[in-house]
Amino acid sequence: MRYLVSGKEMKLLDQNTSQVFHVPELVLMEQASMAFVQKLLLLKQNKLSTALIACGSGNNGGDGLAIARLLREQGVFVSVWQAGEEEGHRTSSSYDVQKQICSAYSIPVVQKEKVSAGEASYDVVIDALFGTGLSREISGELANDIDVLNQLSGWKVAVDIASGICSDDGAVLGTAFRADDTITFSFGKKGQYLWPGNEYCGKVHVVSMGITQESWLDDKPHTAVLESEDLKKLPSRMAHTNKGSYGKLLIIAGSVNMSGAACFCAKAAYRMGSGLVRVFTCEQNRLILQTKVPEAVLVTGQENEEETLLAEQLQWADAVVFGPGIGTGQRA
């Protein structure tokens, strides 16, 4: 089971780690950046020569600056585009520290004109413009900056989340970076798994930045994604049971020329473990249902007797599914 968090929950975890457990914000930033670089190089099997890192003016941009320095240590020729500063946005204190370090190491800085002109090509384009705290629409020059990044060739990777994607619901806030991969910290974010955010974030890789379970304090994550490993936790069926031990499901589905919905619904019912399945449908669907789902019991009748038949079936059933392919006519 993979737990997912919202932007607000992630901010709270950061704060708890810094304020309750006294881990400085800059230490968390360094650990996040190191984990990002390790994963990035692993994904490309250390075959990266050039990288462009586009940095916003907040902590996500600070991550980007640290990533640039760490990639340079690994022999990658890096260029930093300080997009947030270019557009006149106020910088965070951690960003300022990382900028000073990059300046001391003489890490190359490129301007928007050079990036948009396509004067250089990059093996990887790294998006560190906006993080999970974004809640406003991106507009103006910063929206144009994202469009410039999207037009570049090369492998595109987002830091924590694709810029412009709401971490809570996956909405596009004006415009968004289109990543091939996203390397996110500590937990997956809800918006990375919901449409359309999942299309912009690409494949999501979760790495540790040093935030532990203790940072939840008295709270806990509320959202999770089930994985194939979780299926092993489901109880096996006992040897002395039969199909009647696993519930009786009545499916009221299908109409003339709409037999497919009833078929798919019956198959899904068996797939999820229903014991006895009856399909209440019109007589015209008999042949295809008995051919496609022979294990289901078929119940049909003439119009003048359907009401009585349906009442009997409702008494029999433990649960009822109503509606797939039922149509909008008088019979429905």
Short names for language-model regions:
Residues 117-119, 175-176, 312-313:
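Structural alpha-helical scaffold elements that stabilize or flank donor/cofactor-binding regions
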Residues 1-84, 92, 181, 192-332:
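Small-residue (G/A/S/T)-rich helix-start motifs and N-terminal tracts that mark the onset
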Residues 110-115, 142-147, 168-171, 193, ...:
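A generic local structural motif
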Residues 123-124, 129-221:
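Internal gly/pro-rich beta-alpha loop/helix module
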